[in-house]
């Protein structure tokens, strides 16, 4: 017997969060570890979970046969059964639609908050209520732009030359991955036009949303960052000299192929240089099974590493918790964000909060908070020579590194930790609800 949440939360504004991965208590329910992505959702929940006058319902899909529900922190956690993986989820499937319809009937939300347009479960949740419940989408990444820039810096000949059996078998070669993003961008357009309300951080993101859904209402809120990063402070004297930390990779958007080309130039001048790469990786696979599982992109990156003999200069850290990430950043000399497209880059913001001197490709919405020569340095994504020069500049100039790192830390801590997610989100929810009442 499923509980009627009306008996628990009748006096509160009820907001249903639709997330593309389990967060908070949902991870415990499904016995899953912390993910390295989506930390802003965890931080937002931590801030909102005890807010007065609002009750959250956190829902995502899982591989199961029945709806699971539990209550924690006074909020509802709902695991929605699915017979499909999140990547192959069909938003038009009658079973999927019926399960989301049950969730809406059970929790009876006043408003639906969709976290990201990346996966089809978001569209399914919106279709399940047929436009009757006001909805808002928090933009995590603009899929149309990710598709446009997916293979930047990798020529078609290299995409073919380094194609692997596993990618051929799975129809997952780089140009096929790019086409999948374009397909997902079509779904993104449906999501934005149905919800008609979006939360963005940058003008770049707002412009992209309006190009897709011209009449959508845009609300601004800065990306919430885990406060654990403010507990660590970069110090020039204590950092590992000539070491670089970067964002987790695994696919071309993150720009590791360009970073490797720049790093090769750095190593010529500083043979002791180290590049630390977080996240799970099959890059240096040695056993037969792991080598057979290597992706085209991993194989392409490894070809650059091997060509320049960088194997001993690269350290794969594996998956890191937020605190481990903060600690590792604080021990490196320089941070580089090399992506070909980013909406806001939480990783870059986290690094700035720690106080490490940073370098970023000039992409997406980064320029909203990142100022060249003041709190960091920009370079064009397809100019690894410039990136290498900027890294070397930091290595050579202690005063510059300390100045840029200190400025970035001061500005980002003031900006991010002055944010009241409670006030921002609740104000947005109330504005959307009031508009909905007026129009209906």
What residues fall within each predicted segment?
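N-terminal subdomain of nucleotide-sugar transferases
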Residues: 1-66, 73-76, 133, 419, ...
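Conserved donor-binding/catalytic core segment of Leloir-type glycosyltransferases
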Residues: 16, 235-254, 260-267, 275-278
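A charged, aromatic-enriched C-terminal amphipathic alpha-helix characteristic of glycosyltransferases
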Residues: 399-436
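Short hydrophobic beta-strand element within catalytic cores of glycosyltransferases
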Residues: 357-360
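Aromatic "clamp/platform" in nucleotide-sugar-dependent glycosyltransferases that forms part
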Residues: 340
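Nucleotide-activated donor-binding/catalytic signature segment of Leloir-type glycosyltransferases, i.e.
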Residues: 289-319
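Conserved acidic donor-binding segment of nucleotide-sugar-dependent glycosyltransferases
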Residues: 372-373, 377-384, 393-398
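Membrane-proximal helix-turn-helix segments that form the acceptor-binding/catalytic region
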Residues: 43, 159-197
């Amino acid at each position: 017997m499923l509980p009627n949440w009306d008996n628990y939360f009748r006096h509160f504004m009820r907001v249903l969060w639709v997330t593309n991965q389990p967060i908070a208590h949902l991870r415990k329910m499904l016995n899953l570890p912390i993910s390295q992505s989506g930390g802003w959702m965890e931080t937002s929940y931590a801030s909102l979970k005890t807010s007065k006058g609002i009750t959250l319902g956190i829902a995502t899909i899982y591989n199961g046969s029945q709806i699971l529900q539990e209550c924690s922190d006074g909020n509802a956690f709902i695991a929605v059964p699915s017979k499909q993986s999140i990547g192959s989820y069909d938003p038009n499937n009658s079973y999927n639609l019926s399960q989301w319809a049950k969730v809406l009937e059970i929790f009876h939300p006043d408003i639906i908050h969709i976290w990201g347009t990346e996966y089809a479960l978001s569209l399914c949740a919106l279709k399940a209520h047929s436009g009757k419940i006001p909805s808002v989408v928090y933009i995590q990444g603009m899929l149309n732009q990710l598709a446009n820039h997916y293979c930047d810096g990798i020529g078609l000949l290299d995409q073919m030359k380094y194609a692997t059996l596993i990618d051929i078998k799975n129809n997952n070669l780089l140009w096929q991955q790019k086409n999948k993003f374009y397909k997902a961008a079509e779904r993104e357009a449906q999501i934005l036009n149905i919800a008609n309300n979006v939360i963005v951080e940058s003008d770049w993101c707002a412009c992209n949303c309006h190009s897709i859904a011209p009449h959508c209402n845009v609300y601004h809120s800065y990306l919430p960052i885990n406060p654990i990063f403010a507990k660590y402070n970069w110090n020039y004297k204590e950092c590992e000299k000539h070491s670089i930390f970067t964002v987790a990779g695994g696919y071309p958007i993150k720009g590791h192929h360009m970073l490797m080309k720049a790093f090769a130039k750095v190593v010529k001048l500083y043979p002791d240089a180290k590049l630390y790469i977080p996240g799970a990786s099959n890059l240096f696979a040695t056993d037969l099974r792991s080598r057979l599982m290597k992706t085209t992109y991993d194989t392409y990156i490894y070809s650059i590493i091997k060509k320049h003999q960088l194997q001993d200069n690269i350290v794969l850290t594996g998956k890191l918790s937020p605190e481990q990430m903060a600690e590792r950043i604080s021990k490196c000399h320089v941070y580089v964000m090399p992506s070909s497209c980013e909406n806001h880059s939480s990783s870059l913001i986290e690094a700035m909060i720690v106080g490490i001197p940073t370098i970023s490709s000039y992409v997406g919405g980064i320029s909203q908070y990142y100022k060249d020569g003041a709190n960091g340095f920009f370079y064009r994504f397809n100019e690894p020579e410039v990136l290498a020069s900027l890294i070397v500049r930091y290595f050579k100039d202690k005063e510059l590194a300390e100045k840029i790192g200190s400025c970035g830390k001061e500005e980002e801590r003031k900006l991010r930790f002055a944010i009241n997610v409670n006030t921002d989100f609740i104000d947005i929810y109330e504005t959307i609800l009031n508009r909905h009442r007026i129009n209906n």
